[in-house]
């Protein structure tokens, strides 16, 4: 092995080691960050724009049938754009994280109600992140029974057209890309609504 090959190999190994340490540091920083869901835009369930619906009479018969069948079969699909604010403990350091998959759950009055998985890559950074997502939506189950009561509470809250942040908790559990492969975070991260000023 020539002197230049040895130096090149040594520099390459140092770069890989530094990159791995940086990604581990970034992963820790994102785990310790504060998350705030700022906005949800263009929420569609099975292709139906539910943000424009004010009540049951606003749905066509086919839209209602499609949604009811999907809820009954636990095959509901959602697409939306989330605006997620990430506040790092050390904002002066530039960090980013690639999420390869993200489990999520929605709690209504502290009770797990809906859950799903986003299976497309997303990139997070400090600040406001615009995240267009498509996801499955299933009802949570306890002892084999679906949580229809939680879904009913959610529908009642939505129909009241008021601030839902006191009743809803959104949690995420991302799987992130690291130098040694994909790693799922060990627990859910609570994504609160915007902080009041």
Segment roles from a protein language model:
Residues 1-8:
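Bacterial N-terminal signal peptides that target proteins for export
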């Amino acid at each position: 092995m020539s002197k230049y090959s040895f130096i090149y190999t040594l520099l390459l190994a140092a770069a890989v080691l530094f990159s791995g340490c940086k990604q581990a540091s970034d992963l820790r920083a994102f785990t310790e960050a504060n998350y705030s869901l700022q906005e949800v835009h263009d929420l569609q369930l099975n292709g139906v724009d539910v943000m424009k619906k004010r009540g049951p009479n606003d749905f066509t018969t086919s839209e209602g049938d499609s949604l009811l069948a999907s809820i009954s079969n636990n095959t509901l699909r959602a697409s939306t754009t989330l605006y997620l604010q990430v506040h790092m403990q050390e904002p002066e350091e530039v960090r980013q994280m690639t999420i390869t998959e993200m489990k999520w759950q929605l709690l209504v009055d502290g009770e797990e109600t809906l859950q799903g998985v986003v299976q497309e890559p997303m990139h997070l950074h400090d600040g406001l992140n615009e995240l267009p997502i498509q996801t499955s939506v299933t009802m949570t189950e306890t002892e084999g029974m679906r949580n229809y009561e939680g879904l009913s509470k959610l529908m009642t809250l939505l129909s009241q057209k008021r601030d839902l942040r006191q009743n809803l908790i959104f949690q995420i559990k991302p799987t992130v890309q690291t130098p040694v492969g994909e790693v799922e975070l060990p627990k859910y991260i609570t994504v609160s609504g915007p902080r009041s000023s």
